[in-house]
Amino acid sequence: MNLLLKNCHIIDKDKDIYSDILIENGKIKSIGTISEQCDQVIDVNKKIVMPGFIDLHTHFRYPGQENKEDLYTGSISALAGGYTTCNLMGNTKPVVDNNEIYNEILDKSNEINLINIYQCMATTKDLKSIEMINFEKADRKIKFFSEDGRGITDSLLAFNIFTEIEKINKGIMVHAEDHNLTKISTRYAEDLETIRDCYLSLKTGCRVHFCHVSTIDSLEAIKFYKEKNAPITCEVTPHHIYMKDSDFRVNPSIRTQEDIDCIIKMIKNNTVDAIATDHAPHTKDDKDKGACGMIGLETAFNIAYKVLHEENDISLNKISELMSYNPAKILGENKGVINPTYDADLVIIDIDKEIKVGKFNSKSNNSPFIGEKFRGSIEMTIVNGKVKFEKGAKNDNR
């Protein structure tokens, strides 16, 4: 099975060219002026073609909270936002703290067969931050462990977790929050645990990825320890670069313009590695009761384009690096650029078309961006060489 994309405006971390793309058996075979006969030919008509976006931080709520989202609706929501790969957090019900639940999620995702799914496993049993799981027995397919949704406040426990994860050559995704300080200051809570975990990464050699970094001091700490060659990476969310001084409940909290300015600076100097959505679906009742989080897969690119490119003159090449290449590198996958032999995970974007945020493919609609207008319409998403989503087609429920 082969697919030819004609008249593409190709943009990845290095390229900004007009060319054709030949896809064969799920891989990019060649780039150039291509005239050979193919099973399927799509004229892109000079729209932008980028590597599919990779979300390092997603909640699909399966198992246990399928009233908010499930693997199918989450995957369609991802495709509608140009995402071809999602890395799921383990704070489900029951918690992903054993191989049985871990493989159940992967098996079901493979049956649905829409996007590439990776799944994190918890670091402690039932996410209670008391008893470590048996890391030696954890499935070797696991890329990262995570206690996402809460920090590991006990420093001795954190040290032991980092040490055990380093032994098996895996990584940890850290939700930096010292819960002893949260009621005093969510800023202090994030900063203190970020500084501690940077130090532990340096001393243990454990690969640490910091989730949803939102403050000046946390970013400065990450920069400082990166310069000491600690094996750390970090992500920021679209809502933390777009919203300021808002009471919309997310964790970590929405910060100030000064924090946003620092995030932009740290994107430009390469301290920030990735943009990740922290897509967190909730029902209206849960939000009314104070649940933290928002959906983000279907608006992430638009916000990144507006804030980074239109307002701060950051190139689409850099946005591709943040949303595709670096996340692929962090996961250790052959994705994220448009080169021969790489996975044919692609998104086609009409960058001149305006969209108005309204209906979502997600089961939930807990978004503060409803009614806002952005440039950039996701027209088609291709996963492993197959068209999995087309705007307005039968699986687009907006």
Question: What label would you give each PLM region?
Answer:
Residues 1-36:
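N-terminal metal-binding scaffold of metallo-dependent hydrolase/deaminase domains
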Residues 34-50:
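Active-site metal-binding motif and surrounding structural segment of the metallo-beta-lactamase
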Residues 47-109:
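Metal-associated gating/positioning segment near the N- to mid-region
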Residues 107-122:
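A glycine-rich helix N-cap at a beta->alpha junction
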Residues 130-275:
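Histidine/acidic residue-rich metal-binding segments in metalloenzymes
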Residues 188-205, 268-275, 279-351:
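His/Asp/Glu-enriched, well-ordered alpha-helical/loop segment
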